[in-house]
Curated annotation (Swiss-Prot):
This is UPF0260 protein CKO_01185. It comes from the Bacteria. Belongs to the UPF0260 family. InterPro entries: Puta_zinc/iron-chelating_dom (IPR005358), UCP006173 (IPR008228). It holds the Pfam family CxxCxxCC.
C-alpha cells in the first residue's frame, strides 16, 4: 500500500534534484527559452544584463533548440545546467523549475509537467516567444537590453 501512495506523488515532490534521473532532470525544463537569450556582462561590475536576442539555435516560435543534442558543437558558449553547477546560475528566471525546486518551492501552475503542454506557459507570457529577436537581425546588442542599467538610458 505504501508503494502505491508513493507512486502517486510526482517525482519532483518525492525526490531531491540530486536523486532525479537524467530524464526527470531534463523534464523539469519548461522550455521557456529564457536561458537561450544572450546576456551581456559589465566588465567593471560583473553585473549581468539580459537581452531579447535569441541564440541562433533557438526556434523562437517553439522555444526549442534546433540542435539540442549537438548544441555545443554549434554554440560552444551554450550553458549546460547540472546538479553541480546549478548554484552558480544565480541569473536563472524566478519561474525556472530548477531554481524553484532548489529553493524548496513548488512548480508554477502553468508548468508543462502539470498541464501536459506548453500552451499555458506561452499564455502566461513566460516564454520568450513574444519578445525574442533573431541574432542575425540585431545590429547593436545594447539596444536589446531588457534590464537596462541607469547608464544606458
Amino acid at each position: 500500500m505504501a508503494d502505491t501512495l508513493m507512486s502517486d506523488i510526482p517525482f519532483w515532490q518525492s525526490k531531491t534534484l540530486d536523486d532525479m534521473t537524467d530524464a526527470e532532470w531534463e523534464s523539469l525544463c519548461d522550455g521557456c527559452g529564457q536561458c537561450c537569450l544572450h546576456k551581456l556582462m559589465d566588465e567593471d561590475t560583473d553585473e549581468i544584463y539580459f537581452t531579447n536576442v535569441a541564440c541562433r539555435q533557438l526556434n523562437i516560435k517553439t522555444c526549442q533548440c534546433r540542435n539540442y543534442e549537438r548544441r555545443f558543437e554549434y554554440e560552444p558558449d551554450c550553458i549546460k545546467l547540472t546538479r553541480d553547477n546549478l548554484p552558480t546560475f544565480e541569473w536563472l528566471p524566478m519561474t525556472c523549475a530548477y531554481r524553484l525546486l532548489a529553493e524548496g518551492k513548488g512548480l508554477p501552475g502553468w508548468h508543462p509537467l502539470l498541464t501536459g503542454s506548453k500552451a499555458a506557459m506561452h499564455g502566461e507570457r513566460i516564454s520568450v516567444r513574444h519578445i525574442a529577436v533573431k541574432e542575425s537581425e540585431v545590429r547593436d546588442w545594447q539596444d536589446h537590453i531588457l534590464n537596462k542599467p541607469s547608464w544606458a538610458d
